[in-house]
A protein has these predicted regions:
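Small-molecule-sensing regulatory modules
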Residues: 1-36, 40-43, 50, 68-72, ...
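Structured loop/turn residues at beta-strand edges in well-structured enzyme cores
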Residues: 60, 79, 166
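A conserved helix-loop-strand patch within extracytoplasmic ligand-binding domains
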Residues: 69-73, 78-134
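Short gly/ser-rich anion-binding loops that grip negatively charged ligand groups
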Residues: 43-47, 55, 86
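Glycine-rich, N-terminal phosphate-binding loop and its surrounding beta-alpha-beta segment
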Residues: 48-68
Length: 313
């Protein structure tokens, strides 16, 4: 999936700057090679998928790198780097993929009792427990098509201690991820934004480069989607204000209508029982101010305590 996204960026760069030679460099990070450990053991998504690539940009090995924005940590300073471009946002919602013989009505009627839902995202796990109070959420990793194959074949998910969990009855996944690997037909149910607020930046592809590499920044600016970039700035400002870490069930999503932006963000505990949310609107050309206001409102409602309780010990 990451390769397909990178190839799309290369096509767009060649379209706006046909004289440049775009070389795609494949990186296998710790998060790619280790498909059994929880991402938290590699420093969260930032440590697993982003940190090694960032080092390559800073060293000059790469001019730029593609990231799924939701995988980029938003609570840490990244001196020397900048998001040079974001692509137009893909559908940001989360969906349910079910094994044969299971329906969404089965889950709702039973409140999830006797069912196992697979995900590796703490936000999705918290929302799953909130929506289906008696469900068992199991650690489930792998590429989108690999996870669906495991579901269909009733395969167990290996754990780093040598054990295993599963098999899963359902998976919660990103709609855009399934679409990219041609598995949109497996979507059994799409959660509304009200039911399951997306992760900050979900559906946005970002291109990061060195902050002082003005030639690369100028080229990336030519493929930048302004609305997507403003949404990224607003949502990531919430993460910065909350100092949310990789194990924090934090969600955030913004929309733009004309000159106005609306932003909603939430913080949950891992069990899904504690839930706080804040929503505000403001000028679309001042996204960070809006994100800061929403983040401060969440802090006033007690977000810091929930986040601290979820912090790894």
């Amino acid at each position: 999936m990451a390769l397909a996204q990178t190839e799309e960026i290369a096509r767009r760069l060649n379209a706006v700057a046909p004289d440049i030679d775009v070389e795609i460099v494949k990186f296998e990070t710790t998060g790619d090679s280790d498909q059994t450990s929880k991402l938290l053991q590699h420093g969260g998504k930032g440590g697993a998928f982003v940190a090694e690539i960032r080092k390559a940009i800073i060293s000059g090995e790469l001019h730029a790198a593609m990231h799924s924005l939701k995988d980029m940590p938003g609570n840490e300073d990244t001196p020397g780097l900048v998001i040079g471009a974001t692509l137009a946002r893909d559908p940001p919602g989360d969906v349910l993929v079910l094994r044969s013989g299971v329906s969404i009505d089965d889950l709702r009627r039973s409140r999830g009792r006797g069912f196992k839902i697979g995900t590796n995202a703490v936000r999705r796990a918290a929302y799953a427990r909130r929506l289906f109070s008696e469900v068992e959420v199991i650690h489930y990793r792998g590429a989108a098509d690999t996870r669906v194959r495991k579901l269909d074949n009733s395969e167990m998910q290996r754990l780093p201690d040598g054990g295993a969990v599963g098999p899963a009855d359902a998976l919660i996944m990103a709609r855009s991820g399934l679409e990219r690997v041609g598995l949109a037909n497996r979507i059994a149910y799409e959660f509304s934004i009200e039911e399951m607020l997306p992760a900050v930046g979900q559906g946005i592809v970002a291109v990061e480069c060195a902050i002082n590499d003005w030639q690369t920044r100028r080229i990336l600016w030519m493929i930048d989607d302004l609305a997507s970039h403003r949404s990224a700035d607003a949502e990531r400002e919430v993460l910065w204000v909350l100092n949310g870490h990789c194990n924090s069930p934090i969600a955030g999503f913004s929309t733009i209508q004309g000159t106005q932006m609306s932003l909603t963000a939430s913080v949950l505990d891992e069990a899904g029982g504690l839930f706080i949310q804040a929503s505000r609107s403001g000028p679309a050309n001042r996204p960070r101010e809006l994100g800061r206001a929403v983040g401060l409102e969440l802090l006033a409602k007690g977000a810091a305590e929930i986040i601290e309780r979820s912090r790894p010990r």
